[in-house]
Structures are given as C-alpha cells and as structure tokens.
Amino acid sequence: MTDNQEIKPKKLTLGNSKLSLNKSFDSLTGAQSFVNAKSKTLVEVRKSSTGSATTLSLNKERNSLDQTVIDANKEEFNRRLSILKKAAEQSQLNDPLKISTLSKLASINQSANSKIEPLETDKEVEQKQQNTEENKVEVSAKIVQDDEDIPSQIPKKKEETFVKSPLVGKRTRYGIESEKELDKTAESKIIAPKIKLEEPKKFKKADLFNMLSDDESGSGRTRSLAAIKRAREKEKRKLVSQAPEKVYREVTIPEAIGVGDLANAMSERVADVIKELMKLGILANASQTIDADTAELVATNLGHTVKRVQESDVENVLISDDKVEDLRTRAPVVTVMGHVDHGKTSLLDSLKSTDIAAGELGGITQHIGAYRVTLADGRAITFIDTPGHEAFSEMRSRGAKVTDIVIIVVAADDGIKTQTVEAINHAKAAGVPIIVAINKIDKPDIDIERVKNELYVHEIIGEEAGGDIMIIPISALKKINLDKLEEAILLIAEMQDLKANPFGSAAGVVIESKIEQGRGTLTTILVQRGTLRNSDIIIAGTAYGKVKKMTNDKGLEIVEATPSVPVEIQGLNEVPFAGDKFNVVQNEKQAKDIAEYRMRLAKEKKISIAPRSSLEDLFLKASGNSKIKELPLIIKGDVQGSVEAISGSLLKLPSDEIKLRILHSGVGPITESDVSLAHASSAIIVGFNVRAGANALTAAEKEKVDIRYYSIIYHLIDDIKAIMSGMLDPIVREQYIGSAEMRQIFNITKVGKIAGSYVTKGIIKKGAGVRLLRDNVVIHEGKLKTLKRFKDEVKEVREGYECGIAFENYQDIREGDTVEVFELIQEQRQL
C-alpha cells in the first residue's frame, strides 16, 4: 500500500450553501459520500489513512474548490442581473409595469446573493429561462476537470440535515487493511440516502399582485384574494352606476292609454311620467288611463316624438278593395219572410224536397236556417229562412241585410197580418227587390184579388197593375208554380248582375250560432267574398278562432266555401251574435286585438245607455219603500238568435211598476254557476230548448231555485207576463151591498148607542164597511161593530128585515140617518 493512492475524479454539482469540512479525519477515516439535494448526484470521496499531512492537503484543496464554486455563482448572478437590466432599459417606455416587476426580481436576487446561497440562483433559473440550465452544466463540467478526488461535504439549507455514510473499515491484528481493499469495501457498502425533495412553491396571482401593488413606503401588506375580488366588483358597480345615454323614441299614442303603458312605450320610469302629470296638474297612478292629448304633452316634455293613431285603426286590416278582373258571377241569396204559419218553411221544403218543417215545434221556425238549392240547369240559389213570430223581428232584420232578394209569403186564406207588414218594411229598408208569393192557393174559398188589394195598401203593386213587384200565386204543399218562382228569382238575379271576388281572404255574415255538447261553438255563416278554408283564423264580432271543421247545409264536411255558400264552422272561442260580420285575418294576435277593441266599445256603450236612477228612487230603494219591483231573470237558449229574440220581447213588456232585469243570457245548457247566480239574486232561470245538468239540478233543489223549460217562444213570453202580473199590486175596488134606515136610537149601558134600523136594499153584513149619511152628506166612514136581530148576534140581515146596528168608535147617530154598507174587493191586475 502506498500513502498517496490515486483518487478517481467524481462528478461535482452546485450546492445550496458554502462547502466546508466540519470534521477532521483520523487515521481510521474511511470513505464518505454525500448527495446534493438539487442534482441528486452521488459523490464519493476516498480518505487517506496516512495521517495529518494528508488531511492538510485535502483541506487546502477543499478550500480552493469552495472558492471556485462561489466565484462561479457570482459570475452567473452578475450575468443574469445584467440581462435583466438591459431588458428593463429597452422596455422602459413601453411597459413601466414590467420594469417595476423586473426591478423587484433583481432586488430579490441581490438579497439572495448577499446570503451566498447558490441554490437560490438555481431556483430563479428554473422559473425564468432554460439557458440557465446550460450555464449550470458548463460550470459543473469545469469543476470536474480541475479537481480530482477532493473529499468534501456540502451543507444543505438549515432545514435539511447532513447525511453521511458510515465509516467502513476492518481492523486486523496487524493493523488496518490496505487502503485499496478498504476503498473497495467502502464502495460496495455506500448507500445513497433517500432525501425528500421540496417542490418549488407555486406562483399565485396574489403574490404577483402584492409585488406590483406594494407602495413606495414599503408597508408590504398582503392583500387577500377576497379583497381583490371586492375591489373588482366595486369597479364594476361604478361602471354600472354610470347613467346610460338617454334614447329618444317615436311613441305611438292611441285615443286613451294607461300611465304604465305610456311609460313602457317611452322606456321611462313610471315615477317620471307621474311627475310630469303632476306638473300638468293631474294626479294619476300607474293603472289610470289618460287621454291622448295629455299623453302627447307628457311624451313631448320628456323629449320623445309622438305618433297619434285612432283605436279603430286595428280594423283597417279588414278593409280591402276587389279588382274588377277578379269578380265572378255568384248565386243569389234569397230570404223568405212572412207571418206565422203562412208556409215559409213548407215552401223551402218543396224546393229542397226535404222535410224541414217536420222538425219545427208548433210549426214555427225557431231560428234562421240557410240552405243551398241546385236547380236542374246547374244554377244554385241560397235560401235563408227567418222565423215569422213577432219576437224574431231582430233576426228578420238581420236576414234582410245579407240578402239579394226577399220573398214575402202571404197565405191566400189569411191575408196580410202584422208580421207580414213588418217583413215588407224590413225589405224596403234593406232596398232589395221583393217577390210576393201568395201561398195556399189549393185551398177552397180563397180570394187572391183581396190579397192583392191589401198589398196595394202597403205600396206593394204588382206588374199587372203597373208596378215593378212580381206577385206569383203558388202552393207549397201541392208544388204549384214553384218553377215560375225559381224563374223569377233567377231573372232578378241576372238583372242585378251579382258578382263577387272568390280570391283572397274570406268575409261574410254570421247567420246563426249555438253551443253543442261535444262539438263546442257552432256558427252558421254565409260567405260573401273570398274563399274560406280550413285552418283560417277568423274574427266575428268579439269572437275569434281557427276554423277546425266546415260542413255544408247537407251535413257533409267540406274544405272550402266560395261566395254565396252557407256553411257551419266550429272553432270560435265564444258565441257570436247573429248578423255579425266575419273576416279572415293573418294571425291570432291580430284577431285578439280586434276583439279586445270591440269589447271595449261594447262596454262603453253599455255604460252610456245604463238607466239612471233619480235621487228619490235611490232613497226609496235604500229605505225599502220603493214602489218599483224587479223580476230578475237568467235566460239560456240553444242558439244566440233565439236568446236575443226572447230578451227583446221580454224587455218590451210594458210596466211602470215591474222592472224586468236580465242578469245573464247565453247559449248552452243551464250550469251550476247559473244556479248560484239565481240563488244570490232570487232570479228565475228560463231554459229555451236547453236543460240543466245533473249538478245544476242538485244545486237548484238544494237552493230552491225556480227553473222553467220552454220549447215555444210565445209560451215563454205568456208565462213571464203572468209572473209579472202577479207581482203587481192588486186593484182594490169598492162594491156596494146594501143600505138601511135608522128609525130609533137606543142607549144601552156598557154598549153605547144602538140604532134600530130597517134594511131597505141589499144586505147588511157584520164587519163590512159602512158610511153614515145625514141629509145625503157622508159624516162618517167606518165598520159595523154590532149587528143584532132581536137579542141575537147575526152575521147578516137581508132586505125587508129589522136589525140593530152599532158603529166602532162612533156614537153620533140620529133617527133618519142612512147607512150604506159596502165591501172592498181586490182584483188582480194584468199587464
């Protein structure tokens, strides 16, 4: 063994603290190993066992190695610092924030250098750029080349502990084993310690924010993320709170508008609109309605422009003109009018060869029917059958408005009647041609000339007499002269040149409407222009909806209807009135707007025509001494026209003491809500061709509500008239029954004066009313207190007998006075 064994060079790396040798080696010192925490490189140092001389040489070499590492770290730091300063100078004008950041990083690096912690420089290199690793490799390689077999110990950070490999050696009786053997043994037994590496700390936003937000005073206060979020939200609130630029709009103002609606139209606050109204001297809330002039002033004061529109403009979409080239010839619409039982429906029955009249109760048509008859030559005629009863004058007038020709049916054996005259007046008012059909000429003992003379009285002059009205004798039952009637209709239609536009949106008139269980609202309409198709959206009065199904007068389902074709449709949301015009619109919103406008008009009209009560009537009603009685009614019918006819007839019943009040009228069966309303108002429910449901009947029995059913209209009117007559106060009439002459006066104790009398005429009844006449002057009127025959009390004494008479609370009687006896009789009044 030699004292100076050659030590193989080992790879060195940068440590995190100053290299030092804290422990001296003795002769038994063996090999040591250590691990750098960053490079994880195992360094093995062989120790010489030659004594103190070897130890001194090792210490010198180790000190020189330490100085070399420190110098390399300083050079690396200075190089990086110069790069950072140059970058800061170049971007000084562009990014001052980045310069401050680099300055702070430079100060951090300088403080780390003052503590001589080379490992700190390695951390910065790892965080910044990759070329730092290359510099580290170059420095490590240089150290490995200059120094060989230098044992050293590199201390870690103060939180890390030194790890040493145990001394490896074997004593023998002759001393320690040879150094070479010792080195081999040490190499085989050196174990690399497991060191837990510390992960680099993550760089958070708060750290960067703290570095950037530190003021010059160097307070170094750390801001939390919550504080940063609060600051950001505060900035956002400041931005939101900034008033946006006001937008001025063009405001459309109708005839009346609510304050809230006006504010929405201008995109203004309701409070601002109310302030403007207060400036004008108007106190209003958000739900109050103001007129168009006031709304225009408010909008102008707020800087908006105003566009005035009429509320009726919503109906402008319904108005359209037809082009001449689009017009096509259409079938005539004929209305049949006349008195009850003069043969109107029988005439249509003969024309259609169907038994329509068999379905009419009492032989009276209860509602309008629309039928289309196709003749042998292919031409068609549309007939509208109107009821003849006087209650249906409103329906008849509507029928005259939609017709082209009017046929007035007059019975040859009955002549002109009240409803006949009314039908003539309706036809004249409508300005349509008239054809008179004198029916029932097959009956014996008829006088057609007498009927013609009666027509002359009403200015209905036939062609044979120089007039322009065609008078045709017919027999609907025997089908006599029906062909002449059809020829007359077609001739007049040809002279009128009836045309319509079958293209475009449909329009027409509602003939009748009703509610049918399981099918909903059914409406009979007559198309006057355009073509009506399934799924069209129509508006009729205040009712609107989509056409779900169409059927013709024969009950067959069809997909479209052209002008002069009557159809029954279903799909409306409510029952329209007979005579209402219908139009097809583009969408449901348009229909809804028009319906709402019409409902407002109807409501305003109803309020304006409401009966006004005098102050005296109000006081009498409040005290319960009102002389006017009320009969509340609820009317339900099968079709709208019948309900209107019933209401109109009942309201025409004359009475100054009874006021007929119709609480509700509608189409459909009697419901439980109708019963509840009747119970609350003590009303009578009238059902015309409808019945009450099971629940309604149960409720009516429980609440004792009177429900009456009718199928013929004049029976209903007579019954209501009788009820109103029963409510009238009866007439009290005085009926004379007899007289007596006083012949002698008797004074009886405890009784008073009794007149001995002789019955001269009629009978004297006890309890009847009496008048005492003296010299033909009435001096007292009262009642008989006592009536005696001799000593017996009797109820009456007839003519020619004597009796004793005493008066109630009256004693001034004399001989020769005359007594008249009478009774008060109550008679029921009639309307």
Swiss-Prot record:
It is found in: Cytoplasm. GTP binds at residues 338-345, 385-389, 439-442. Residues 475-477 are annotated as: G5. Residues 329-499 form the tr-type G domain. PROSITE patterns: G_TR_2, IF2. Residues 439-442 are annotated as: G4. Residues 117-139 have a biased composition (Basic and acidic residues). The keyword Cytoplasm applies. Residues 338-345 are annotated as: G1. Keywords: Cytoplasm, GTP-binding, Initiation factor, Nucleotide-binding, Protein biosynthesis. Residues 363-367 are annotated as: G2. One of its GO terms (cellular component) is cytoplasm. One of its GO terms (molecular function) is GTPase activity. Residues 385-388 are annotated as: G3. SUPFAM superfamilies: Initiation factor IF2/eIF5b, domain 3, P-loop containing nucleoside triphosphate hydrolases, Translation proteins. Residues 116-157 are annotated as: Disordered. NCBIfam families: IF-2, small_GTP. Belongs to the TRAFAC class translation factor GTPase superfamily. Classic translation factor GTPase family. IF-2 subfamily. One of the essential components for the initiation of protein synthesis. Protects formylmethionyl-tRNA from spontaneous hydrolysis and promotes its binding to the 30S ribosomal subunits. Also involved in the hydrolysis of GTP during the formation of the 70S ribosomal complex. This is Translation initiation factor IF-2. The lineage of its organism: Bacteria, Pseudomonadati, Pseudomonadota, Alphaproteobacteria, Rickettsiales.
